[in-house]
């Protein structure tokens, strides 16, 4: 029976390239001349720390980072940006988490969405991915279109397509 997996993954190498591009763009921006501003990637914790001297510049820095991520093919919804910034002395910072894997809550939403569509497929939650199995390829392709069209706040990839 044909099947595929729904996953949510980010290539850390691409995130690293996006952070480097954002830092390069930061060094050439006139409004950041003489300002202490840094974008750092922590690959072990899967976070990006953005630090600068004012709250407004912090938002500008995040926009630069999002632009660099989009250029590298990383969906902006895979960045979990906190609403509040941390304030330490004269510096403001935000710790942006990278969304890897599908949380159980979102996996249940995907399963419910697929079951409500009345397509003849079965879904299984397997850790941080959802396996979809059906009798025909057309049903599986319909599921892919359904999940792509749903706004679940996270980008999804479809891999392991087997006949």
Swiss-Prot record:
GO CC annotation terms, alphabetical: cytosol
Record keyword Transport present: no
Keywords, alphabetical: Nucleotide-binding
GO molecular function: nucleotide binding
InterPro entries referenced in this protein's UniProt entry, alphabetically: DUF520, UPF0234-like_C, UPF0234_N, YajQ-like_sf
PANTHER family, alphabetized: UPF0234 PROTEIN YAJQ (PTHR30476:SF0)
Its biological purpose: Nucleotide-binding protein.
UniProt family annotation: Belongs to the YajQ family.
Protein name per the record: Nucleotide-binding protein Asuc_2113
């Amino acid at each position: 029976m044909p099947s595929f997996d729904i996953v949510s993954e980010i290539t850390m190498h691409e995130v690293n390239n996006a952070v480097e591009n954002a830092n390069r763009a930061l060094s050439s921006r006139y409004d950041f001349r003489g300002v202490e501003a840094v974008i750092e990637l922590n690959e072990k914790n899967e976070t990006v720390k953005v630090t600068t001297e004012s709250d407004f510049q912090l938002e500008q820095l995040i926009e630069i980072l999002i632009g660099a991520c989009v250029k590298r093919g990383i969906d902006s919804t895979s960045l979990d940006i906190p609403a509040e910034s941390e304030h330490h002395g004269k510096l403001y910072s935000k710790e942006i988490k990278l969304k890897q894997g599908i949380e159980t809550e979102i996996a249940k939403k995907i399963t419910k969405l697929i079951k409500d569509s009345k397509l003849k497929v079965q879904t299984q939650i397997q850790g941080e991915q959802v396996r979809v199995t059906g009798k025909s390829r057309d049903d599986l392709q319909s599921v892919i279109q359904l999940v792509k069209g749903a706004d679940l706040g996270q980008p999804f990839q479809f891999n392991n397509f087997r006949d």
